[in-house]
Amino acid sequence: MTEFESAPAYQEAKYLTSAAEFDQLPPDQGAEIAFIGRSNAGKSSALNIITGIKGLARTSKTPGRTQMINFFALNEHERLVDLPGYGYAKVPRMVQKRWEELVDSYLKNRRCLKGLVVVMDIRHPLKEMDEDVIEWAVNYDIPIHILLTKSDKLSQNAAKKTLGEVQTAISAYGEKLTLQLFSSHDRTGLDEVKAVLSQWFRSEP
């Protein structure tokens, strides 16, 4: 068995580097899975729970604060990537445009990118910018997995109802998009998302 055939040790994640510009990205080799979502949708909390490392990805009380791409190494060849959050109304238009250019360049040109996890608060799914990000990734032929986070905030029936509604809304994209319920609070869906990530890491280039 080679190093690429075994499941990644997510608990071994370590901060690698941050990039504010496309030319600051680490070498485009190995395999990466990126996480993206609206500010305060629970993206950083999801990364912390998946790796089991509290504080790995910084959570912020100020939406839109993080405007850099953060890389976390699982091993020499595999990385998790925390893309900057979006959708905060108080961010100046110039900052928003810079975010769009940086993220679009990353999604379009990053050859080692295996998949994109789109994080959405289950109480506010599929906002306009969520749909824009999905369109970008679909156009660049990037597999997408949606995490409907904070599922513990809804009753079980309400969460399942929202899951079904989002599934219907994205059905036109076909098998390129998958989704699940997730909660960093009670760990709902943790094994499921880890299985998706591991499958992506094991996929052929």
From Swiss-Prot:
Here the disulfide bonds are none
Q: Name one GO molecular function term.
A: metal ion binding
Q: Which Pfam families match?
A: MMR_HSR1 (PF01926)
Q: Which Gene3D superfamilies match?
A: P-loop containing nucleotide triphosphate hydrolases
- Domain of life, per UniProt, equals Bacteria
Q: Does the keyword rRNA-binding apply?
A: no
Keyword annotations for this protein, in alphabetical order, are:
Cell cycle, Cell division, GTP-binding, Magnesium, Metal-binding, Nucleotide-binding, Septation
Q: Which residues bind GTP?
A: 37-44, 64-68, 82-85, 149-152, 182-184
The cofactors required by this protein are: Mg(2+)
Q: Which residues form the EngB-type G domain?
A: 29-203
Signal sequence, renumbered to the chain: none
For this protein, the record's PROSITE patterns field holds:
G_ENGB (PS51706)
The residues listed in the UniProt record as binding Mg(2+), with positions renumbered to this chain, are: 44, 66
**Any one GO biological process:** division septum assembly
A single cellular component GO annotation: cytosol
Similarity comment text for this entry: Belongs to the TRAFAC class TrmE-Era-EngA-EngB-Septin-like GTPase superfamily. EngB GTPase family.
Primary role: Necessary for normal cell division and for the maintenance of normal septation.
Descriptive protein name: Probable GTP-binding protein EngB
From the broadest rank down, the organism's phylogenetic lineage runs: Bacteria, Pseudomonadati, Pseudomonadota, Gammaproteobacteria, Legionellales
